[in-house]
Each structure stands twice: as structure tokens, then as C-alpha cells.
Amino acid sequence: MREKGRRKKGRTWAEAAKTVLEKYPNTPMSHKEILQVIQREGLKEIRSGTSPLACLNAMLHTNSRGEEGIFYKVPGRMGVYTLKKDVPDGVKELSECSEESSDGQSDSHSSDNSSSSDGGSNKEGRKSRWKRKVSSRLSHPPSPPSGCPSPTIPASKVISPSQKHSKKALKQALKQQQQKKKQQQCRPSMSISNQHLSLKTVKAASDSVPAKPGQMKRTKCADIDVETPDSILVNTNLRALINKHTFSVLPGDCQQRLLLLLPEVDRQVGPDGLMKLNGSALNNEFFTSAAQGWKERLSEGEFTPEMQVRIRQEIEKEKKVELWKEQFFENYYGQSSGLSLEDSQKLTASSSDPKAKKTPAEQPKSILPSEASPVRIVPVVPQSECKEEAVQIPSPSQKEENQDEARPDSKSPEPVLASASNTNELITMKPIKSPKDEGLLEQKPVACAEQESEKENHVTTTSRNNKSENQEALAISPSKSKNAGLQKPIIKPVAEASPLNPDMKMPPATVTDQIQESLKRKSSLTDEEATSSWEKRPRITENRQHQQPFQVSPQPFLNRGDRVQVRKVPPLKIPVSRISPMLFSTSQVSPRARFPISITSPYRTGARTLADIKAKAQLVEAQKAAAAAAAAAAAAASVGGTIPGPGPGGGQSPREGGERKIAGGGSAGSDPVSTNGKGPTLELAGTGSRGGTRELLPCGPQPETNMPGQAQPPGISGAQLQQTSSVPTGLASSGACTSVPLPAHIEISNSEKPNLHKATATAASPCHLQDPRSCRLEKALSPTGPPLISGASTVYFVADGTVEPKAGSNKNAPKPSALAKTTAPAPLDMTSSPVTTASLEKLPVPQISGTATSTGSAPSSSTLPAASSLKTPGTSANMNGPISRTSSSIPANNPLVTQLLQGKDVPLEQILPKPLTKIEMKTVPLTTKEEKGIGIFPGISVMESSSREEVNGRQAHLAIPQLGKPLQSKQLSQVPRPVFTAKDRKDPCIDTHQYREGLSKTTQDQLFQTLIQRAQRQSVLSFVPPSQFNFAHSGFHLEDISTSQKFMLGFAGRRTSKPAMAGHYLLNISTYGRGTENIKRTHSVNPDDRFCLSSPTEALRMGHADYKNTTGEISSKEDESDEDRVGDEQEPISVKEEPWASQSSGRHPHHGEASSTNDCLASKNGKTEAPVSEQTTLGQENYIFSRGQASDEKSLPRDFIPAAHKQMTHAVRGKTVCSSPELFNSTALSLPADSPTHQPLLLPPLQTPKLYGSPTQIGPSYRGMINVSTSSDMDHNSAIPGSQVSSNVGDVMSFSVTVTTIPASQAMNPSSHGQTIPVQTFPDDNSIEDTPSKCYCRLKAMIMCKGCGAFCHDDCIGPSKLCVSCLVVR
């Protein structure tokens, strides 16, 4: 019983059905009846969940289709089967044809499949099946599915829609061809050359084939080009041309020959012995695929005389190994089905097959062996003859050859060709198709044995097509030939249609040769696959595979890549997104790639939805529009500016997003930023996007939010909205949320200022209404609420720069009042800030053009941050955004970038290290600004609460840190650095003054921050530590380092930090921020602190943000923190007066604390190093940072991550207080040098406790910061630089611990000193390791930088064909 059960279980449907039919031998049964018997008698265990009837039906279809099939479909009835052995041979053939015809429509699919699977036991069956397969493929022109599956398809005289369709298709094809011809004129075979075919082929095509599209009249003759890729048939839907109606128009003998190319299933033998088309023969998937395959091969140029000659040569070469091949021939045709070579040969050789199909196949096979050598016999027929003649001619040639061999067999293919050309191209195509397909198959297989067998098969098929081909093939192997004939024809129906006509045009010999070669080639494949599947499908698959590798893969790929890549670089294109991941994951070695990456990258992270893509595209458009405004500037920004911003932002964005996502809430924040970073990066061409995005990248608390934003913005606001949208979510989620909006705004800032205005308007508009300061303030405040989402983000963006100006500056720009605070565009913002002082004045130009770039891409990132910072308190929030934006903004609208791109007076120093210096410069402007009342911004308003002076000081600090931060962010690749440089140089003194001036206020803010920080400490690292750190750092620096320190403390450090993270690192984040995402998250607090350091306002904001985010946002990215600070700070700013006051007081105490715990602060912020450095080696650090920054900024853009990391390491080391090793690689290591002083840096957590309520938490959070911090402290001239460094370090750390850290530090240090440190502060090895690993230009092709030869993605390198580093240098 058990055995029986097992048997029952293991029994196949075929076995069960066979058992049933054996039990009722002479009773043909339908599949339903068979199933009933199976179920009744329990012949097969039917598992639940299967549809027995469908399974059984499919099996019957499959196994009734080939000669090896065990079942026979009864001719005149629907789905009625009997066992083959029960059917007499004579009837068998008829019944097979008719049953196939009746089953035709549904049959063709399954039967083909199963025939390949059933591996017929008898070789003859296999041969016949191959034959049928080939023929079915060949003559399966898509005829509209005929309602009548009746065996005979009467030639309907009524014009059916299909006929109309075919006429239409022909006319259309003719039109297309004529157009094509006009373009290519005398080079119809050009397309061939583009394929894998050689020029030789092209030449042959053009020479031998006139390739005239030919009017319809001529088309009816043999004038259609069926050889060259130029053929009208390439543009024709063969299934529309070849249908039962057009087929019925052909001469009878032609029809019969063509029918032989179809699988037996698809033709029926009538009582008169004449074959007729099955109802579905030309309307099934097999014929469709055959037509498609033939068309593909035609377009590849496989049928050109040149290719045919080549194929023939290959076949001849293969002949040398023919014996060996023959030995293994069975492997392809006989082995799998259990047939021996002898059997297959016998089957092939026996031309007495009862079935017409078999006979033709066999005859050609037998003949082929005898006439194998004369493959080119067909050439005898002149091609010049009319198509009708041509049809006949091939016939004669075939007939002659056939006569030599088995005339019917070899004749059938050739006559088919002839008749096809004569009566209809369509038919001709079919026959040729099969040979060609086979040829194609043959080409594929290279193995000698395979090739030889293929040869035979091909020859057989060819013999049908051409006698000489048949002869050759026959010599090789009859059975193979037959298989090739059947199989290949199946595939070739359409493929050969085109060639047929050319063949007609060409001498028959050519046709024959073509067919032979193509058939042979296909044969080889066919042989291999014959065993696996006798059906048309395998062949098709083979054909397709071969064809595609040959034609589609080689050129189309390159062409597409070349075209798309170039045009995609400037705009954000979907392909970039796809490409970016892989491409950029190469560890982001080339920053140049980064920028372009950022272009595409922004959306790479997170969802790559249609909405994303659309938003991206819109963003790009918006950016382009924005860029259009500053054509040169935009272009420059796009190339150069973007490089810095987008490079890191874009590249990192995805990672950052990913990391952030992982991180959690904070992570989420980052993600949006990431996306935004990409967006901004995308804005490469645009300006704001990139800057804004980058900065924001970190802030985006929620990737999802970011995604929605992306999806949301239909147009320019795509990025913006994305950020804005993100902001709400992020804000709601956590203080960091504000950060998210920032990115959106930033992102939008340049290209999407209008949108930004809208988005920002929501939050910022209230501010707008108010006085700029008030606006800023309110923005900061309103951001707290819904405005925070859009307003906060807006504000931040305003502060940040281009985008921020949208909310603040931009918005203001649109609205003069806002402009005053944050000079509308990023440049204005920067200008505003810088305007106040001479350095600012200088900055305005650089800032607007260079400063902005260096700081935050014009005002957007660094400048705005700096300006914002300067303007700050209110800007502080903005600064946060802006800082983050510094980086991103710089690329797009950044004047500095523009200047750089334009080759203007933006020195490299400005671009790289100067941003830090610039920060200091900015500080002075801040003071001036304050005096002017412009630098106030919402940030100032916020600070107003504390005191204008403090605000000023803070602004100065903010500005410097922001600059530093933008610098940092730009360090990756930000032109803004030069701006900083300019400013820094000018500002060193001013910075100091500002520091002092803002000391009290800054101190107050710092006290506030300290208080808040303490509260935050308690609330954990989330954001409090960063905030506290910033406050502490700010205060600390103020007290300890007096002006410089104060500057650093006065949010400058924080801002700077943030920029490094947000701007520079944001870029990194998006590119390689992900890897550091965790770190970043870890240093969420640090980033916040850093942000705080960025500027007093920012510090407050930071504190506030930290405070708010402490609980939930600590892990948000530094950028997020920054953004949060911007948003949260804004929120605090909304509430901000109090927070500011409290922060001020807290900060003050903290300031003192910072003073006392300079190292702690540094360490806490990752600034420890900076403060310590400042104390111990302030000058040195400054110096180091200066050159580090210069180097850093230069390199970062260039190498972005890798370079940044290295430079970071070097810078850190150079600074000695680069950062604590604790956090990240080199930066941290560098810190150790200053370790004694930087112990806190080294032990950021410990120092964090000192600096923050919960230093431990902060410490980890600030590891990255620590790295930067040291640098920052080192900068004695400006505490801000140190602070910035710290903040940046945090930023860097957070994102890319080392990279960000160093940049911040560097930014800070250069602030006071010339950026001497050649090594970038950003050695972030971690960052490099983290982020460089993935480039988010997954789908981009790699191109070489014309400047340095580095490879990166098309998107990354951009239209200038220069990598980020080269762009920055230029």
C-alpha cells in the first residue's frame, strides 16, 4: 500500500493521463474527462491548492506538441487527446497538426514549454518537434487571434481590422524608414555597425543592400531590405504584417513552404494532404517572440551579407571540429531526450517521415551532409530579380538544391523565402527569420562541438532556406539540421522576415549564406538547448540572449549611458538615483563624483518613488531656473559649488538617510536631510538645493518625512517641499525636525527660492511680516509650531543661506524686510552679515559669490550661516539651517562657488580653509551687522532677548562658526571656504572684537545654554548635550579664549560645527554620512553643541533644540541637530526669548564652566580638542586649522570623503587637537596629540559631562565633534573656530565622525588664522570608511575627471567634467 501511495504521490500528470488513455485505448478524451478518471481512480494524488485541470491541460498541451510528446490532440475537436501510439502514422500527422491547430491558441505556450521539458523519448519526435518549433516560430506571424481554431484558415476576403492594421503598420514603417534614411542617407547599415556587427557588416549592408524603404508598391515586390538594420522591417510590427489574411494572399506553394517552418501544432493537414494554417499559428506568443527575435536580429545586422559571411566562416571553422561536435551533438539534440547520436542521425536522415514536417526536416538533413560544403549554393539566384521573381528565384535555387538533396525539405525554407518576398515580405521574413535565428543561436555557442552540431542544424534549416546551406548542415548532422531547421525557424519567423527580403535583393547565395550562418549560429545554441526544450521558446530565449548580448547590450548600453549621463549630470535624473548607490559606494573616493552624486543622490536614499523622481526632476528644473538667474554663477555653482555641497551632501545623503533611518528619530531626521542633500546636490546645477540640503540633511529627522517632501514637491519645491514636509514630520518628531525643513528650504533655496518662499512663507511669512529681526525671531519662534516645520526650516534656511534666506533671507529677499536680516538670497544673507564689517563687505562679494560659497554657498550655507550667525541670534536658528546649508548652499547659488567656477577672485584659500577664518571675518561683520541692525535676524531677535550685544557677539560667533561650519561642510567641496578665508583674514581682529563684544551676551547665551544643556544633559544626549556643549563651548570659549573663544562659543563654533556637519558633512552625510550616521546620531548632542557653538543664537537654538530634542532627538544627525537647533532653536526662539535668556544664563555659567572645562568643552563638543588646543596651542591650533582648513576645504571637495577624512586626520594631527581619537579615526587620533588638553576630546563623553548636564551622553554624541573641536579650540584667534571645530567635529563626527569633526575644527581654526593646515581637518577616516563606501549615483556611469583623471559618476562629476576637488581648485 505504501509503495502504491508513494507511486501515486510521485506520479506526474503525464503518467496519470497516459495511464488513463491506456486504460481506454481507443477513446479520445478531453482533459476534463481525463481528470475525472484520474480523480475517480485516484491515479494521482492531487494536492490542495493546485488546480488539477489547469495542470493537466497544460501538460496535455505540452506533450501533444512535439513528436516526442506522448499524446495526440485529435484534429477536429477541442482539447481532445489520445495516445500517440494509438494513432496510425498517417493519421498521426494530420491529427497532430489539427489538434495543435485546435489547441493552437492556448497550446502554443504550454506545449512549447512542455515539449522542451518533456524531452521526447524518440529522436524522431524530437526532430519533428524542432522542425515544428522552427516553423512555428518562423511562420507565427502575429495574426489576429482568429476566432476559429478550425484547422483550415480560409483566406478571408473581407478586410479585417488586422489587415488594416498591417497596412497601417507598413505605412508607418515606411515613413519611419524614410525619415531614418534621410538621416543616414546612404548608410543604411550604420545601425549595424553600432551593434556588435563589424563595420564590415555595415559596408556590406550598404553595398549589397540598397536598403530602400521602398513604397508599398515596391514592397510587394522583392525590394524590401531584409538584411540591414536600416530595413523598414525593423520599424514594422511583423505581427501586424504577418497574419492569416496576408498569409492567405501568398501563392499556395509559398504557403506550404512557409507552413513547414511552423511547429506541427500550428499547422494542420487537410484531407487533401495540404497543410493549412492553424487558427492561432500566427497569433501566439511563440510566433510573437519569433517575430520579435527576428526583428532584433535584423536590427543588429545579423542578416547583412557581411555578417552572413562571417557566420559562414565561423561555421567552416567549426567544421574542423565537426567529428568532435558530432560526438557531442547528442548532448544538445539527443542526449537530454535519451536519443543517441545515431538515432538522431537516423531520424534526420530518414526523409520518409510520414509527417510533412518531419520529411522536410529530415530531407534537408540527409541532403545537408551530402552537400555540406556548398553552403553558398543559393547565391546562384540573382538578387536583382523582382521580388516576385526573387520569391520564385529562391524557390528555384532551393528547388535545385533540394533536388540535389531532398527537394521538398531544403526547398521549403528557400521557397518560403522566395514566396515570402514574392507574395509578402512578411512571409519571407518568417523563413529567413528561422535561419537567422538559428544563425544567431549558432553564433552564441562557441564550443566546437556545439558549433559543429549547430552547423548541421543551421545547415539543415538553411537547406530549407537554401540548398547549399542544407548541404553543409547535412554534412554535419541531419538530426541537428532538422532540429536547427525546426527550432531556428520558429525563432526566426520575424527575425528572418527582414533578411529574407534583403536576401531576395541580394543574390540568393547571399540569402542562403545569411540564413546558413545565422541558422548555424542559432543551431549551436539550439543544439545545446534542443535537449532541454524542443519548443520554439527555448530557441527564442537563446536567440534573445544572444542577440541582446550582441546587439542590445554592447551599444545601446554605451549610447544610453553616454547620452543620459551627460545630460543627467546637471539635472537630477532618475537614472542617477538608480546608479548612485553602486557608483558612489566606491567609498566616494572622488569628491568630484560626489557633487554630481549629490545631484542625483538626494533622493537615492530612502524611497526612489515616482514622486521622488518627479520631485527631483522638478527640483532640478527649479534649480536650473535659479541657476539661469545666475547663469554663470549657477553653472559654476552647479559644477563647482555643487561639487562641494552636492558631492558630500548628495553622496552622503543616501547614506546619511540610511544611517539616520537606522538611528531612529534622529536617524529619520538625517534621512530627509540626506534626501535633501541629494536634492541640493541635485541642485548642483541649482544652488540652494545643494547647500540647503546638505545642511539640512542632518536635520531631517525622518527619512520618511524627507521622502514625503520629495514626493510632495511637484516642482522646484520638490526638494524644498521634501525638506519642508520633512520638517513638519521631523519637527513634530523632534526638535531635529526643524532641521529637516531646513534642508528642504536649503535645497530649494537656490533653485526653488519661490517655492521655498512658499514653504518658508508658511513658517517664515509671519516673520516676514515682522521686522527682519522680529521675523527671524518669530521664525525661530514660529518654527516651534507648525511654522517650525516650514517656518523653522525656512528660518534656518534663511540663516543658512540661499534657502534659508527663503525663509529668512530668501523670504526676506522676496520681502525686503527679511532681506535686511538675511539678505534675501544666500549672497544677501551673507552680505547682510558681512556687510556690517569690512571683512563682511569683502565677504559679501565672496560670500555672495565666494563667501557664500565658502561659508555656505553664498549665504545659503556658510555665508548665510555666517551672515546668519552674524545676524544671529535669530539667524542662529537660521544659522543652524544655514550652517547645514552652508555646504549645500555653497554649491548652487554660492557666489563663492560661482566665482570659483567663473575663475574669479575666489582664492582656493577662501574656498577651503578660509571659511573658518571667514567665520571670524563674519564675526566682525556680525558686530557691524548688529550695529546696522541687519545682522540681527530672528536669531538676533532671539538674542535680543538676551541682549543685542550678546546677539552681536553671538552673531559674530555664529557667523564665524557658521562660516566654519559651512566651511566644514564645504570642506568636502565648498567654494565658500575662500569666502571664509577672505573674511577670516580680515576678521581675525574683528572676530576678537566681536567676541569680546558678544562676550557678555554670548556669555549670557552660553549661560542659558549651560542651563539648558544641564537640563538637556539630564534629558540625555539627544540634543541637550549638543546644545549644552555649544553653550558651554561658547561660554567656555568666551571666557577662556576671550574673543576667539567667545567667538567660538558664540555659536560661531556651533554654527561652524554644524556647517561642517550640515554643510560640509551634510554633504558627507548624504554621501558617506550614513556610515557616520550612527556616530552622528551618537553625537547627536554633539552636533547640537556644535551647532550651539556655531553661534550664540545657534547655541541657544542648539540648546533649545537639544533641550527639545534631548529626549527624542539626540540621535538625530548632527545636521539634524543643527537643523533642530535651527528649528528647535527657532522653536526656542519662538519660545526663544526665554530659552535664550535661560540659555544665556545657562550658557554663562556654562561659559564659566566651559572656561574651567575648556578641555571638557572641547572634548564634549569634540571641541575639547579645540578649546584645549586653544588654551595650550591656540595659536598652533589656529595655524594648523588654518592650513588644515585650507587644505581641508580644498581636498574635501576634491576627495570629499576620502580626502576629507585624510585631511581631517592630517589637519587634526597638524592641529594636534584635531579631535579625540575616541570618536573617529584620524581626527580623534589627531586630538590625542593635544590629548592632555584635549583629554575631554579624547574622552568626549567625560568632558561632555563636564560641559553638559549629561556629559557622558554628550561625549559619545560628540565624538565626532571632538575631533573637530580640538581644531576649533586650537583656533585661539577665534573661539568660534574652535567652537566651530568642536561643533563641526561633532557634526563631522556625527556624520562622518572624523571628517566632519576636522572640518568644523578647521573651519574654526582658520577663522582666526590663515588656513595653513594643508591636511584637511576631515581626515574622517571613519567618515571615509563609513560613507565613501557607498556612492549614491548607483545608476550613473563612471566618467573621468578631465582635471585629475579621477573616476566618478557622471552625475557627480557634472557638466564641467571636473571632479569636486578640481572644481574647487578652479
Swiss-Prot record:
The modification Phosphoserine is found at residues 150, 477, 524, 553, 590, 601, 1121, 1254. Residues 1119-1131 have a biased composition (Acidic residues). Residues 11-86 form the HTH HARE-type domain. Signal peptide: none annotated. Keywords: Metal-binding, Methylation, Nucleus, Phosphoprotein, Repressor, Transcription, Transcription regulation, Ubl conjugation pathway, Zinc, Zinc-finger. Residues 103-120, 849-870 have a biased composition (Low complexity). GO terms for cellular component: nucleus. Residues 643-652 have a biased composition (Gly residues). Residues 229-338 form the DEUBAD domain. A motif (LXXLL motif) lies at residues 258-262. Residues 141-152 have a biased composition (Pro residues). A motif (Nuclear localization signal) lies at residues 178-182. Its main location: nucleus. The modification Asymmetric dimethylarginine is found at residue 594. It is found in: Nucleus. One of its GO terms (biological process) is positive regulation of fat cell differentiation. GO terms for molecular function: chromatin binding; DNA binding; peroxisome proliferator activated receptor binding; zinc ion binding. Residues 186-198, 719-734, 830-839, 871-891 have a biased composition (Polar residues). Contains one Leu-Xaa-Xaa-Leu-Leu (LXXLL) motif, which may be required for an association with nuclear receptors. Belongs to the Asx family. Putative Polycomb group (PcG) protein. PcG proteins act by forming multiprotein complexes, which are required to maintain the transcriptionally repressive state of homeotic genes throughout development. PcG proteins are not required to initiate repression, but to maintain it during later stages of development. They probably act via methylation of histones, rendering chromatin heritably changed in its expressibility. Involved in transcriptional regulation mediated by ligand-bound nuclear hormone receptors, such as peroxisome proliferator-activated receptor gamma (PPARG). Core component of the polycomb repressive deubiquitinase (PR-DUB) complex, at least composed of BAP1, one of ASXL1, ASXL2 or (probably) ASXL3, and one of MBD5 or MBD6. Distinct combinations of ASXL and MBD proteins may preferentially bind specific histone modification marks. The PR-DUB core associates with a number of accessory proteins, including FOXK1, FOXK2, KDM1B, HCFC1 and OGT; KDM1B specifically associates with ASXL2 PR-DUB complexes. This is Putative Polycomb group protein ASXL2. It comes from Mus musculus. The lineage of its organism: Eukaryota, Metazoa, Chordata, Craniata, Vertebrata.
